[in-house]
């Protein structure tokens, strides 16, 4: 039963050396140079406004160049010279008792003073719009703050700007929910959930109504020029209403900042062929077959009006969006439903 022994196997003492991989130099990271990671949803990964609007905004944004500073300095010097010349002419007319020249100089001075006053009012309104952006940045900081007292004062200031007094039901619910242990972040979150939706609901209602009116008007209007004029008028009115809801009074220059997106709507209303092609892609084949070309154009114009309203809300709103940002798809479903009802009534 003894098995034969296997032959001996001799191994070399030195095994062949495998090539060692070359290691890269180590990298040291600290907390200051590291970038915090926060996961985002797929909807937030692609901005809803689109790259076209960002390109237009970048193109229309004024650039502070050397030539512009030289022009501003020249205008300021010319204004000072004109003011000095006016004072000298007024003095000479008074000394020489030239009453006709004195009356003309006085009238011109009143007109210039009115113009300067209008520019001062416009600058104040533009500063108010820029201040709203600073308030939004402050709100972002408070949402990450664990301090106390600042959040409540900030929210009470926003309520006064919006015209909400202490007797408003939303303000009373917010004040009843506050506790001494709440920090700034918790106070601001309560305000965003109890008080801010009062204004947001009104703004959404204005957007829905303007988008519906634009849709129906474009659908029945036979002239492209009428379409463009109607879209421009409705969009300007929508901007003014949204700004007034959030306690902002728009002037000429401050309205220009929000008017940039109106240009997209005007161009959209004039490009009828492009509207027809894009409108057919937005809807299902069954619904597109039942709609006319003008109805498809109306839905497209209504969607861009809704997008303009969402952008105006974002610029006029004092708080950043938490999880209640309006989506274009919500307004799209409303517009398609209204077009369906209109077609059914017309039969």
Curated annotation (Swiss-Prot):
Q: What's one GO-annotated cellular component?
A: plasma membrane
Record carries keyword Amino-acid biosynthesis: no
Chain segments carrying region Disordered: 1-48
Transmembrane spans: 70-90, 99-119, 213-233
Q: Where in the cell is it found?
A: Cell inner membrane
Q: Which Pfam families match?
A: DUF697
UniProt keyword list: Cell inner membrane, Cell membrane, Membrane, Transmembrane, Transmembrane helix
Q: Does the keyword Lyase apply?
A: no
Family of this protein: Belongs to the UPF0283 family.
What's the protein here called?
A: UPF0283 membrane protein ECA1987
What organism does the UniProt record list as the source? Pectobacterium atrosepticum (strain SCRI 1043 / ATCC BAA-672) (Erwinia carotovora subsp. atroseptica)
């Amino acid at each position: 039963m003894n098995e034969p022994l296997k032959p001996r196997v001799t191994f070399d003492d030195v095994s062949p050396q495998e090539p060692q991989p070359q290691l890269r130099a180590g990298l040291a990271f600290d907390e200051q140079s590291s970038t915090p990671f926060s996961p985002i949803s797929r909807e937030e990964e692609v901005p809803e406004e689109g790259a076209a609007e960002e390109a237009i905004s970048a193109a229309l944004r004024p650039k502070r160049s050397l030539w512009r500073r030289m022009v501003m300095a020249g205008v300021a010097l010319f204004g000072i010279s004109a003011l000095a010349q006016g004072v000298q002419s007024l003095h000479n007319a008074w000394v020489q008792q030239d009453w006709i020249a004195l009356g003309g100089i006085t009238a011109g001075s009143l007109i210039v003073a009115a113009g300067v006053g209008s520019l001062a009012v416009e600058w104040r309104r533009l500063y108010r719009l820029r201040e709203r952006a600073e308030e939004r940045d402050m709100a972002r900081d408070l949402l990450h703050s664990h301090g106390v007292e600042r959040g409540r004062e900030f929210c009470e200031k926003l309520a006064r700007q919006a015209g909400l007094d202490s007797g408003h039901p939303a303000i009373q619910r917010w004040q009843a929910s506050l506790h001494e242990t709440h920090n700034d972040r918790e106070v601001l979150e309560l305000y965003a959930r109890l008080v801010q939706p009062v204004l947001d609901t009104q703004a959404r209602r204005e957007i829905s109504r303007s988008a519906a009116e634009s849709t129906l008007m474009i659908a029945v209007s036979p002239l492209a020029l009428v379409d463009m004029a109607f879209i421009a008028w409705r969009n300007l009115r929508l901007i003014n209403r949204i700004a007034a809801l959030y306690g902002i009074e728009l002037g000429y220059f401050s309205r220009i900042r929000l008017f940039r997106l109106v240009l997209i709507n005007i161009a959209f209303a004039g490009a009828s062929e492009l509207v027809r092609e894009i409108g057919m892609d937005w809807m299902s084949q069954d619904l597109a077959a039942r709609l006319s070309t003008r109805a498809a154009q109306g839905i497209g114009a209504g969607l861009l009006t809704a997008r303009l309203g969402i952008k105006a809300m974002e610029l006029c709103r004092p708080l950043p969006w938490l999880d209640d940002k309006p989506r274009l798809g919500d307004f799209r479903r409303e517009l398609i439903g209204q077009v369906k009802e209109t077609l059914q009534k017309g039969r």
